[in-house]
């Protein structure tokens, strides 16, 4: 949806960062509306915000370990899993996150969320501010994460690219769901093209 449609607010509501005033949020049939973020993390929900998504004074390794703070076992297995998805980070684990590029910070943020082995991953604008090449990498990583069995809910301004890789899409308008369908259906829907995709949909 367009700017101000409520996309990021929706993710924040799911993750307990803003108050839900109506409706319900269910996870496998369990009511989770209004739970605090730490309770949602314990239930297997990870969240990657668009900005301020790393601890800049900590190393990459320390950032990843922060994501496993609720797990009792060693974080080594989790770090190995994250390095499999983001091999560019492997030789730089002791580098401070504050020195990384936007795309590299996004990798660290996604990796930290994955350290808890979430059932659901919420991603807010994973391609924001990235070069076209880095955007392609970000979408590839999102697809790979999803293929590991993690359900992924992604808010994304690059609607065309997002719809190309998603199972289902939801177009928001003024806080309400205006259109729903598979990615292909929405890419080919004349109303969605005219109202939201413009030339991007052609």
Predicted segment positions?
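Glycine-rich phosphate-binding loops of nucleotide-dependent enzymes
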Residues: 1-202
């Amino acid at each position: 949806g367009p700017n101000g449609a409520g996309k990021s607010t929706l993710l924040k509501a799911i993750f307990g960062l803003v108050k839900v005033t109506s409706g319900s949020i269910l996870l496998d049939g369990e009511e989770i509306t209004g739970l605090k973020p730490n309770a949602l993390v314990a239930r297997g929900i990870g969240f990657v915000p668009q900005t301020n998504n790393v601890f800049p004074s900590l190393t990459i390794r320390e950032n990843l370990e922060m994501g496993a703070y609720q797990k009792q076992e060693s974080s080594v297995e989790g770090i190995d899993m994250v390095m499999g998805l983001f091999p560019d980070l492997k030789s730089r684990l002791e580098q401070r996150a504050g020195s990384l590029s936007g795309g590299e910070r996004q990798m660290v943020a996604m990796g930290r969320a994955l350290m808890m082995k979430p059932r659901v991953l919420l991603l807010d604008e994973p391609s924001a501010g990235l070069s076209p090449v880095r955007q392609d990498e970000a979408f590839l990583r999102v697809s790979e994460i999803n293929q590991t069995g993690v359900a992924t809910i992604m808010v994304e301004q690059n609607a065309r690219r997002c719809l190309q890789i998603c199972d289902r899409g939801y177009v928001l308008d003024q806080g309400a769901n205006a259109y729903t369908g598979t990615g292909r259906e929405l890419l080919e829907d004349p109303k969605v093209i005219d109202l939201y995709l413009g030339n991007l949909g052609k």
